[in-house]
Amino acid sequence: MKNVFFAAFFGAACCLSGCRQEAATPATGEHYAFAEEMFRKVWDMYRVPEYGLFSEYYPNSYRPDVNYFDDGAKSTQEVSFLWPMDGVFTSAVALAEVDPVKYGCYVDSMVIAVEQYYDDGRMPAGYQAYPVRMGKVDRYYDDNGLVGL
């Protein structure tokens, strides 16, 4: 029951950076195979299908109290903050660069997922830390920067 979500995708993205190839060349090699395996595991084990989003914990029923909020400890939400979910998005984009046919649908899914964090009810409009449907929460410049990148 460890929070390996971010570490898994950071590792997968790092592995992909070493196997970048021309678009017409099929990807091969152990780095690409590892990136695909990690992507598949995170997609299968951390995805919360009813929202099209991801959990920060496995199993998804694990809900530790988090104590890094100014107003005290809270129980974790059913889905992740925006920034780790953006790591999944980045991994999907990196894999789609190598194999657009296989991973293009994942990128499309992630575009829809990220939009769930978009808050246009406050000015200026921007992406908030949790999906809008789960309530109004803080918006951070670095989250919005990650989405922009």
Where are these regions (language model features)?
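Aromatic-rich carbohydrate-recognition surfaces in CAZymes
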Residues: 78-85, 137-149
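Bacterial Sec-dependent N-terminal signal peptides
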Residues: 1-27
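Low-complexity, Ser/Thr/Pro/Gly-enriched N-terminal "stalk/linker" regions
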Residues: 21-134
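Generic hydrophobic secondary-structure signal
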Residues: 9, 16, 89, 93, ...
